[in-house]
Amino acid sequence: MTAEEAEVDALLVRARIAQARYAAGADQQRFDLAAKAAAWAIMEPHRNRLLSTQAVAQTGLGRVSDKVIKNHRKTLGLLRDIQSVKSVGVIRDDPDKGLTEIARPIGVIGAVVPSTNPAATPANNIINALKCGNAIILSPSPKGVDVCQSLLAFIHAEFDKLGLEHDLVQMVASPSSKIKTQRLMESVDLIIVTGSQDNVRRAYESGTPAIGVGAGNATVIVDETADVSAAAEKIAASKTFDNATSCSSENAIVVVREVLDEFLQALHEQGGRLLDATASEAVKSALFSGGHLNRHMIAKDIDVFLDVAGVQIADQGTAKFVVLPGDSVGASAPESGEKLSLALTLYVCDDFDTAVDKVREILMHQGAGHSVGLHSRNDERALSLGLNLPTCRVIVNQAHCFATGGSFDNGLPFSLSMGCGSWGGNSIDSNLHYRHFMNITRIVRPIPAVQPSLEDVFADYWRAIGERVDASGSIGLSPTDQAPDDHRSAESTHHD
């Protein structure tokens, strides 16, 4: 065993002891107060600003004022979601079905968290874990270590007021390493990964139950029925928030040609600047230098972004983001992928159907399962996208990054981790929320038997194949004659 592995093992020992004490007696009030203590640690205005300032200083990503808003809004929304939720003991009782559901803690949860949201994402995981009676150990990105450490200090200060053990919320100490993260993944009861797709893959291969979320590459359609002015305003607000650190920030816009000129004018009024071919090539060359995103351009203010690219544009003083003309999609056109910067790629299509085809092409290149957006007055088109595109979310007439992770004016749970289903190689297709932080035990009692006849279940099939079947000789099964569960052998049931 290496020293780094031993360090993680020591965290696990302390976490398991603290979690056992915390969960003893299954006290809902204790869980609720602990969750609120963690929430107040990040939401208290002075601490929030300190964390936000530290986040930008340490990671070089985003904007302080927007991180303050994000930390507050995301945490307040989560508290709203879980405010009256029962997360321990009996959470559902259905006498008609003879079922009683009991919420149980998972135990010790590990969470690998990104540098893009070094306070908000850990806080969300911590609150959900505590709400459900768990301990949690964080593995922050190297750039986010100091922010995470400050957050935990604030949480522990709140814990002291309630007499809670600090070991309920811990972190892998600096310096971060792949060895430490791997040991954590292999040792906890559940591992949650937000951010690096390499870490997501490693989590799924660790042998531990894992929840990983997929890559973003949010792509949005503006069709010919859209309120173009409103669409441009929402897209600009979402694209520029926190300098596009969100995985839900728009990366590509697909516009139906009929409203292109009107949309570009509206986008210009919101600070979007369509680049000519020369400037666009200069931005792409700089942004994707060496085959990967340029860290000197991602999540930077627009003046820094343009300076690194060596580009000057008209009305630069009022510019908020740039628009790159798009044509191709795929590895040879990196602008069709996630950019994590104040650059938006614009595709133009003749009609809605070809726009849908373009979105599908983009998602199959990157971002499958995450989300698509639609600005339209035709709600049937939203349903069409949901039925036909490889996506877990269709965001309709909303600022994408404010909607995908939950909003006070939509029904999604507040989260910073969006599951992308099988399309994105994930085990969940929903926003990460409190239900993912608990086990459920089901008590199953006998109820009056409800066994259909063969006529009840096969009549429509027999009609469809044009055959008349005599089922009069069918066998009625007594409870003791039922076929065993398919994972148990006949030999094993013989001895029940």
Name the predicted role of every residue range.
Residues 12, 16-19, 23, 35-46, ...:
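Structural signal for hydrophobic packing residues in well-ordered secondary-structure cores
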Residues 11-13, 212-214, 243-247, 333-340, ...:
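Short, flexible turn/loop "capping" segments at secondary-structure junctions
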Residues 2, 8, 123-124, 200-330, ...:
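ALDH superfamily catalytic-core signature
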Residues 87-230:
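Rossmann-like NAD(P) dinucleotide-binding subdomain of oxidoreductase/dehydrogenase enzymes
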